[in-house]
Amino acid sequence: KAEIEYLDKDYAAAMESFKHLQAVAENPENKEAAKLGLMRCAELTGQPQEALLAANDLLKEPKLSPEIMSEARYVRAKAYISLKQENKALADLKEISKDTRTIHGAEAKYLLAQLYYDNKDDKNAETVLMNFIENGTPHQYWLARGFILLADIYIRQGDDFQARQYLTSLQNNYKGDDEIAAMIEDRLGK
């Protein structure tokens, strides 16, 4: 029932069903599935406190696959950020950003740099972004966001020439159909 509600995008109902499943499940696989479903529903319905609790609960499971562990750390990090507890997100972001081949890893790398930038730690933000650029990712959106953040760092440091170089290169090479073009235009217009 919970799976069907989840697939129908009725996340509030699915959340209740997953809570019920978690309470009555007897085998470890069903308990884990319930915890995973609960965590995903909490994240998708914008409930960071619930997502945090569910992620922590899921991470206590002894036999999680690396993918599920990474997803749980990602959800936990995003929940901490939403709850304005960024410092608690750092360890998870550092761990999952080691593998930028995954969508969570790519976003985590960007978020890690963004947190450093927000805390006026340009040196660490730049180091994270240079590592991201060097290692690459198939997730071009997050790499583009990384280039824009790198340009923001250079702008803040007064190196407008370097910032413009990155932004112009990104403008010429990024093919995505999203807000990246507007972000570039906004910065080049200043």
Show which residues each predicted segment covers.
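Acidic, polar-rich low-complexity tracts and alpha-helical solenoid repeat scaffolds
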Residues: K1-K190
